[in-house]
Amino acid sequence: MGAGILSIVARKLGASFVMGTDIDENAVNVSGENACQNGLCAATALTMPGADEDNDYTVFEMAEKGCGYYLSNVLSEPESRVILGNDYDVVVANILADVIIPLSEIAEEFMKPGALFISSGIIYLKAEAVKEALLANGFEIVEVTQMGDWFSYVARKN
């Protein structure tokens, strides 16, 4: 339940706006419920039309417009990237390395200049491949954290 938990913590730590995205409708719904249980929303589920009639995005609009969740796959649905926008100070991906690697190719589309891309949930066997993908896509690695077999990278777009 990465996006939901991370966005709740970010909001509680002072982020003025957070947006979570997931390809699993249940994860999006539970993220919205978790945000509500933490006092971050007015439990309203909306639907936003996608690029075609068969492709809708479920959106949880939160109280204060400070927290939201989209059902989308940013890797295979370029139209969802337009909806999510490009003005984020931090982009976080807590998911498998096999998703982080292609995500590193498009992460900058969401980021302000100087923003950070934090990737975590990376098993040691894939850590070097993620590092290489970040560097190949123009990121500067500013921090590496290892906890047992798991890695996290904090990177800034050059």
Which sequence ranges carry the predicted segments?
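A short glycine-rich, Lys/Arg-flanked "PGG" loop and its adjoining helix->strand segment in the class I
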Residues: 101-116, 131
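Conserved SAM/SAH cofactor-binding pocket of Class I
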Residues: 1-73
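Core SAM-dependent methyltransferase catalytic element
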Residues: 139-158
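Conserved SAM-binding loop
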Residues: 20, 92, 119
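A short acidic, Gly/Pro-enriched loop at the edge of an enzyme's catalytic core
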Residues: 76-90
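A short SAM/SAH-binding and catalytic strip from SAM-dependent methyltransferases
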Residues: 89-102
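ADP-ribose/adenylate-binding Rossmann-like module
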Residues: 114-127
